[in-house]
């Protein structure tokens, strides 16, 4: 048994995940009723990641700031600029693609009972209120903006603490990181359960009716992942960005695709940053921050579904309005984590720019929920893998200036 486990652990995690993926698809297509209990593996995996992530973020960020030496360089400014630039360019890409390949949709009912935010002010206010959330409540609800703010404050307060206290925090961080590695090793079983549940519950037929819309959405996200992001990274590191891009997509994007949660993928991203040799003081802050504000996939979803509604209703859009939509979708996407339902419930906000009534806008949200299995998975994979990509690009850019190899 020990020999079998040793051989299993010697197989790379990505290969093990692919094995779980294939088995999950086969079970869902061939024996969905008999294999139904398999779905619980996915729920347990996502639950474990979501449980450990808030504690990990609090301790890592607190420790990084408490142990930060005066004059020690971090790349947070560069990373923030990359996050915002990437999200904006994703919105621009979605707007241009929607004009090049206009798609009309059959509006769906069923989302009228959900309350969307009233405007961009409400979204930003919600984000600000999350900053001053009760720390215990923030941990319980996985409010990463609140967790980050408390971790930063506690870290600053502990800057003057004794070395033994700082060492204790470091030991706690190492212990939680070890737990995270144990959980991530269970990813193949988790992915098996998640992919089984998705196919067995939703089926493939429900998605075929919105094929063109899905093609446009996924096409935009793939374009951002394989063209826009590599271009941004190249401008930063001045060398072939694709090895880094593909590694981030492979080791972060795959798990994010199936967990459909940027928060649950934080431990995966932190582990990948460690493998890439990045500075822990930087990535322990930038990764949870990215899970909150780096939302290129959300910007694509908001812009594409809004313009699909516009084309369905035959509304003419001029260039200035299209530019405003690009900016609005980027700003709204950055606030998506502060809204229950995420990017889909920010669609009525963007629709209001074109005078589309809330009733129709909520029907567009209904369409979003129908295609959510694919849309949300691709969106999360893009969002989460980009967190690591831009964190690495910012640090490698500094290494290039210093003449260090990477």
UniProtKB/Swiss-Prot annotation:
Catalytic activity: L-serine(in) + Na(+)(in) = L-serine(out) + Na(+)(out); L-threonine(in) + Na(+)(in) = L-threonine(out) + Na(+)(out)
Entry's localization field: Cell membrane
Keywords carried by this UniProt record: Amino-acid transport, Cell membrane, Membrane, Symport, Transmembrane, Transmembrane helix, Transport
Keyword Transport attributed: yes
Signal sequence segment: none
Major localization class: membrane
Membrane topology: Multi-pass membrane protein
Gene3D superfamilies: Sodium:dicarboxylate symporter
Single annotated GO MF: neutral L-amino acid:sodium symporter activity
Transmembrane segments: 21-41, 45-65, 79-99, 138-158, 179-199, 213-233, 285-305, 313-333, 360-380
Claim: Transport is one of the keywords in the record: yes
GO cellular component terms attached to this protein's record: plasma membrane
UniProt cross-references to HAMAP family, sorted A to Z: Ser_Thr_transp_SstT
Similarity comment: Belongs to the dicarboxylate/amino acid:cation symporter (DAACS) (TC 2.A.23) family.
Cited function: Involved in the import of serine and threonine into the cell, with the concomitant import of sodium (symport system).
UniProt protein name: Serine/threonine transporter SstT
């Amino acid at each position: 048994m020990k020999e079998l486990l040793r051989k299993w652990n010697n197989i790379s995690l990505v290969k093990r995940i692919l094995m779980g993926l294939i088995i999950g698809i086969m079970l869902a297509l061939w024996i969905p009723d008999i294999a139904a209990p398999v779905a619980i593996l996915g729920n347990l995996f996502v639950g474990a990641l979501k449980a450990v992530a808030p504690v990990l973020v609090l301790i890592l960020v607190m420790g990084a700031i408490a142990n930060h030496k005066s004059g020690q360089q971090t790349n947070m400014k560069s990373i923030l600029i990359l996050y915002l630039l990437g999200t904006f360019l994703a919105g621009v890409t979605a707007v241009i693609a929607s004009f090049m390949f206009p798609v009309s949709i059959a509006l769906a009912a069923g989302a009228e009972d959900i309350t969307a935010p009233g405007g961009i002010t409400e979204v930003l206010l919600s984000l600000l209120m999350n900053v001053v959330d009760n720390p215990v409540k923030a941990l319980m609800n996985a409010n990463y903006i609140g967790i980050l703010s408390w971790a930063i404050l506690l870290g600053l307060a502990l800057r003057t603490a004794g070395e033994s206290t700082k060492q204790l925090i470091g030991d706690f961080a190492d212990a939680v990181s070890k737990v995270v590695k144990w959980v991530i090793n269970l990813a193949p079983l988790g992915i098996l359960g998640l992919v089984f549940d998705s196919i067995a519950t939703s089926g493939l037929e429900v998605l075929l009716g919105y094929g063109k819309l899905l093609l446009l959405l996924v096409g935009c996200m793939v374009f951002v992942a394989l063209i826009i992001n590599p271009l941004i990274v190249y401008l930063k590191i001045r060398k072939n960005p694709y090895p880094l891009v593909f590694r981030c997509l492979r080791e972060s994007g795959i798990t994010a695709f199936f967990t459909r949660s940027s928060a649950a993928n934080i431990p995966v991203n932190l582990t990948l940053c460690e493998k890439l040799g990045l500075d822990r003081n930087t990535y322990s802050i930038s990764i949870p921050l990215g899970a909150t504000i780096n939302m290129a996939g959300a910007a694509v979803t908001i812009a594409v579904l809004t313009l699909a509604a516009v084309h369905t209703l035959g509304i003419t859009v001029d260039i200035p309005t299209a530019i405003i939509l690009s900016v609005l979708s980027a700003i709204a996407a950055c606030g998506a984590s502060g809204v229950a339902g995420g990017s889909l419930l920010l669609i009525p906000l963007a629709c209001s720019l074109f005078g589309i009534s809330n009733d129709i806008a909520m029907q567009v949200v209904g369409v979003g929920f129908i295609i959510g299995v694919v849309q949300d998975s691709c969106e999360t994979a893009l969002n989460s893998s980009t967190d690591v990509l831009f964190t690495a690009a910012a640090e490698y850019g500094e290494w290039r200036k210093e003449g260090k190899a990477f």
